[in-house]
Regions:
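Positively charged n-region of N-terminal signal peptides that target proteins for export
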Residues: 1-4
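Non-catalytic cap/lid and distal C-terminal segments of serine-dependent acyl enzymes
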Residues: 32-41, 48, 120-121, 131-138, ...
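Conserved catalytic region of serine esterases and O-acyltransferases that act on ester linkages
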Residues: 23-25, 256, 260-284
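Extracellular serine-dependent O-acyl
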Residues: 107, 204-209, 218-248, 260-272
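Hydrophobic h-region of N-terminal signal peptides that target proteins for export
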Residues: 9-18
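Conserved SGNH/GDSL esterase-like catalytic core that processes O-acyl groups on lipids
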Residues: 62-158, 176, 214-219
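Catalytic nucleophile-elbow at a beta strand-turn-alpha helix junction centered on a G-D-S/GDSL motif
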Residues: 25-85, 113-116
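Active-site segments of SGNH/GDSL-like serine hydrolases
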Residues: 168, 173, 195-220, 470-473
Length: 638
């Protein structure tokens, strides 16, 4: 008898011992009309479908050239010949976009509009169908009058090619109020696991909510029951539908609603996959996180993954790089979102909780956008090592408080001293005054800008001379708001204008008194980014007796007549070129600050000016880090 049992087990195991491709992930999809697809398929839904996203035809469909049981590129419709868009469409699209390139994703979708969950009870299906209306009977015929059996047969065939990695369910409208629904779903789920020789730990069940109450869902009360499903099935996860737009009948989703819901199914599956060994999904905590916090995380494609616990919130968004991403909440009150691939470098971001913009408590904060903001660093490759700390001598960034006679107030500036400053007590150093941009402050260059690491690395490599770098507030922390009835250009000229007296009458004298500096113009430079570039021009050009090096990075310098501006300082090119030891203008290729046009105008006048373009960057900190790296090696070598 034991031999017979062993033989039967071996035969059973042999059924599934196909040459499965572990990199072909297959998902079984079932449910009623919202899984079947009720929304019209739009042009965007049929374009750019990745070759790695496949569907197995659940029925013959001659008009589409599809044969039951065969794999095809997953161009909708995915269910039957004339069904609409489904959550499975954007579930699969999102997975192949986020997963490694060697992973394929396949879906098998068997769904019947208007059905109860009992339709997927294989043993009692025929009895159940007999009591249903003719239209439902006709749909069931497409699946041989037993949708469960059809799904199982297709799944067995699919297992010859790949590995079943999950089950997607969207059903419940026709079972609204049925408190036994979770147990009925459990029966279907366990039957599939048994019949396909699957383990629950490897094949989670993802069940979507029906149209939410926030969309006036007619069956929204069913969501309370759906959310108890994990109590019946520990490996079940509920996909929230809040914020997914509903159709006019308030039973089905719009195409946009299906897209959002499909992405949410995918987001949940990706989160689960991250925990699996050898999943190929790699994310790392952002370097800008507070130590000990795992989120936000960044993946190899540059996407940022956010989590935020706010069980009482009704709506959350992430505002990052000028785009707002809706977050979605699970049953435990944990909100998640994933961005599109972001440019490398530093980016401010905010969480918007029920309309209120707040910082992320998991992230360090940075002063930017005229307020304290969260920030995230999307890492560069080795080309970004110049602004990362290396095994070289490190300087210091000091916070210095001083009294401003011109403003009658105490102020703070940040001062970088090179690594050798303490060990060479008799040596004096040149000074670079370095300004931030609009809506930022004196901390910007040493936090967002990584100025100290850039300087340490350049000095250690011998590319630039040791120097002090002084950063003060440009008095432009608050937004620019012209007064009503005033000329905007005149108002703009006043924005941050208090800084000009501060730097000339308070800051430079204080630095020269406090630190071992070389105090002549030949050893003093000034540069700034954006509005700091504007302030650099306004400070240096009228006072060339105090500065001999000038830099502007994406300078906010507009509407100047190069021949007449600043009392005609550029009119006599020979005089200017002899007076200024080095003149630098830089910007990113993706921004429109007019820098190149200004350079062309200056060169036509005979002005010697170096021009640098940061490839692929816009008005952002990566541009300015690169500009600083290009600028400082030219200082104080004349």
């Amino acid at each position: 008898m034991k031999k017979i049992i062993v033989l039967c087990c071996l035969l059973c195991a042999g059924i599934f011992a196909f040459a499965q491709d572990p990199n072909f992930h297959i998902y079984l999809c079932l449910g009623q009309s919202n899984m079947e697809g009720n929304a019209k398929i739009e042009a965007q839904d049929t374009c750019n479908v990745n070759e790695r996203f496949l569907m197995m035809a659940a029925v013959d469909c001659p008009s589409l050239g599809r044969v039951k049981g065969q794999w095809y590129k997953a161009v909708p419709p995915l269910v039957r010949c004339h069904t609409g868009l489904t959550p499975a469409d954007y579930f699969g699209r999102t997975l192949v976009e986020r997963l490694p390139d060697n992973i394929k994703v396949g879906v098998i979708n068997v769904a019947v509009g208007g059905c109860r969950i009992e339709l997927f009870d294989e043993e009692n299906c025929e009895e159940h169908i007999a009591s249903q209306p003719e239209w439902l009977k006709n749909t069931a015929k497409a699946y041989g009058n037993n949708p469960y059996r059809r799904l199982k047969e297709l799944a067995v065939e699919a297992q010859k090619a790949g590995v079943i990695k999950g089950i997607l369910l969207h059903q419940g409208e026709s079972n609204t109020g049925d408190k036994e629904w979770p147990q009925k779903v459990k029966r279907v789920y366990e039957n599939l696991l048994r019949d396909l020789n699957l383990q629950a730990k490897d094949v989670p069940l993802l069940a979507g909510e029906v149209v939410h109450a926030d969309q006036n869902g007619r069956c929204a009360s069913m969501n309370e029951i759906i959310n108890t499903l994990p109590q019946a099935i520990p490996t079940a996860y509920v996909i929230p539908s809040s914020g997914c737009p509903a159709a006019e009948d308030n039973l089905h989703f719009t195409a946009e609603g299906y897209r959002k819901l499909g992405v949410r199914y995918a987001e949940k599956r990706l989160l689960l996959l991250e925990k699996e060994p050898n999943s190929g999904i790699t994310t790392e905590p952002a370097s800008t996180n507070i130590p000990g916090y795992d989120y936000p995380r960044v993946d190899k494609e540059g996407r940022a993954h956010f989590r935020f616990y706010a069980p009482q919130a009704n709506r959350l968004q992430v505002d990052c790089c000028g785009k707002k991403y809706d977050m979605w909440k699970d049953a435990g009150g944990l909100w998640t979102a994933t961005t599109n691939p972001l440019p490398v470098g530093f980016h401010y971001y905010f969480l918007i909780a029920d309309g209120v913009s707040v910082t992320d408590p998991s992230s360090y904060t940075f002063f930017g956008c005229c307020r304290m903001a969260s920030g995230i660093e999307i890492p560069e490759g080795e080309e970004g090592d110049y602004y990362r700390p290396q095994q070289v001598p490190h300087g210091q960034v000091r916070s210095c408080t001083y009294y401003s006679e011109t403003q009658k107030e105490f102020r703070r500036c940040m001062v970088y001293t090179p690594a050798e400053y303490e060990t060479h007590p008799k040596k004096r150093y040149p000074v670079l005054y370095l300004q931030h941009g609009m809506g930022e402050d004196e901390t910007g260059w040493s936090t967002q800008g990584k100025m100290n690491h850039i300087m340490d690395n350049l000095i250690a490599s011998g590319q630039c001379v040791p120097m002090l770098v002084v950063m003060d507030s440009g008095d432009v922390e608050a937004p620019f708001r012209p007064r009503p009835g005033k000329d905007v250009n005149e108002e703009r000229a006043l924005y941050g204008a208090t800084f000009y007296d501060v730097i000339l009458k308070d800051l430079i004298p204080m630095i020269d008194r406090t630190f071992r500096t070389k105090t002549d113009r030949e050893h003093r430079a000034m540069a700034g980014l954006s509005w700091g570039g504007h302030q650099t021009f306004n400070t240096v050009l009228p006072h060339l007796d105090k500065f001999s090096y000038i830099g502007s990075f994406s300078g906010a310098i507009f509407g100047l007549d190069m021949k007449t501006c600043f009392n005609g300082v550029f009119a006599d090119a020979d005089k200017f070129n002899k007076k200024v030891n080095y003149f630098f203008l830089g910007c990113g290729t993706e921004e429109q600050m007019g820098t190149k046009k200004m350079v062309d105008s200056l060169r036509k006048l005979g002005i010697e000016v170096d021009y640098y373009e940061s490839q692929g960057t816009a008005h952002e900190w990566l541009t300015w880090r690169r500009c600083l790296k290009e600028f400082v090696p030219h200082l104080f070598k004349h």
